[in-house]
Amino acid sequence: MREGPWTGRYPAAAAMVICALVPYLALSAALQPITPIIAGDLHMSLQAMSLASGMANAGYAVGTVLAVLLAQHLPQRRMLVIYAALLVVGSVLAAAAPDAGFFIAGHVLQGLCTSLLLIAAVPALVVAFSISKLRWTAMILNVCIFGAVALGPLVGGIQAQADGWRPLFWIIAGIAAAALVLSLMTFQDAPPADPSATRNPLPVGLAAAGCVALFYGASELLTHSFLDAVTIVPLAGGLALIVVLLVYQYRAKRPLLCIRPLGSTLPVSGIVVAMCAAASSISAVALAAVLLTNQFTPVHLGLLQFPEFIAALITAVLLGLVFRTRGLHYLVLGGMLSLIAGILVLQSQLPPTSLLMALGSGLVGLGVGGSVAPALFIAGFSLRNNALQRVFAIIELLRGVAAFAVGPVLAHVARTVGGSPAAGTHTALWICFGIASAGTLFAVSLYALGGVRPPAPALETWQSGEAPAWYSPPLLARIRDSSRATVLTEPLACDAGGHYGGPRNGDSAEPAADRAGAAT
């Protein structure tokens, strides 16, 4: 196939990623104020709307695994164009939906295609351009994922104030169409990543069954108790299937996902931080906002949450400044502390005042923007860059489960615990505080017990594919007296086909590890 006229141009490729990721992520956060309007127009119950959102989130989580499998055996850039086209189809179906069935199908397709595009496009943007562009990619990723979510409440509030919903969905469809056009303009044919890789569909099946069950159970919490069979059985069963997927991929000789190489100090710390920050941040702001829905107009309430978006922009700039330094690790720590502070501000007075709501959402925005994206790169830099797609897939699967499944559970706690919504929200916010604090303490403890002095990433080494950007010690290295151990991060690297093995070109493990350590 012919190359697009903008092939190799970073601004066009970055714009394509932005247009691909922003629609669904912003829409998922904008739905709350317009949900009653959509339900009334399409003759849906609020429970049906909850189920639609849950299945769309399940599609987002499953797509991360499906994208990796398809990338191994099908031309990657051609698949990216197909994903973008399907995103347009889903967006148009949702925007023009005459009834509930079309809306649910379109919205689920939006969630699925967004994660397919994330896994197909973002790793290529990271490794296909020069190192000088890498910090810009990190900043763009931060704004796309977290800035879009933070902007959602204001966008939804503006649309709710106009007493409609279709204009917003048509705008989303237009942005998706721009992503499709840009994917064609930047097209450069790329072969499958590894046709000899496993074709086993079981990992995708486990992910699909687990996510659908988990998000179905979470969505049913709107009208059922937590211990009702229709909620607790799919919740527990879905979570169990996801655990089975992780264990199965860890033990597999030819895995689809790189689980075993992530089992050292820095990747585990990064993944735990990303999950805890995602689970606590989205829920905290949304829970506090619910208490103010009867006091303010949707636009006013959206403006009170707008500081979260400003904070996401600030943390994107900070990420760019520290990206090549050891400050990357300290940015994550500072982000988690800011997140904890924001949760405490929100729960200090319920319902919160306008000042407390704005201040709390700003601190939460600083927290999630300063922790999740940097933590993803901390995990990714711990492996060779050829494993980046697989690393992003497993991290986004876990982050998506944490962000979208915990929220309905905490919302159920806020509605049912205590004698009033304020009392229930107070309890739910303390749970958010506990999640964020536990994740922070766990990560700091792993650094201490692993004997880690935060390193600066050796980006040249990582970009060349020779070795990880730094050496990540085994878990609990100090307790296990790993100063004499021979287990190194580098031999655990995952090649393009998902095989585990030592350094390339027949090099021994020791020189490869030394090279990575010397570069940092």
Where in this protein do the model-derived segments appear?
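Intrinsic disorder in cytosolic terminal tails and internal cytosolic loops
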Residues: M1-R9, L446-T520
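N-terminal membrane topogenic signal
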Residues: E3-V17, N200-L202
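12-transmembrane solute porter fold
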Residues: Y10-L27, L31-L42, L46-A56, V65-V68, ...
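Glycine/proline-centered helix-kink
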Residues: Q32, I119, I140, I145-G157, ...
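Helix-loop-helix hairpins in multi-pass membrane proteins, especially solute transporters
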Residues: N57-Y60, T64-P201
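Transmembrane helix-loop junctions and nearby membrane-interface residues
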Residues: V68, A95-F102, L184-F187, A218-H224, ...
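Hydrophobic transmembrane-helix bundles of small-molecule transporters
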Residues: G157, Q161-V272
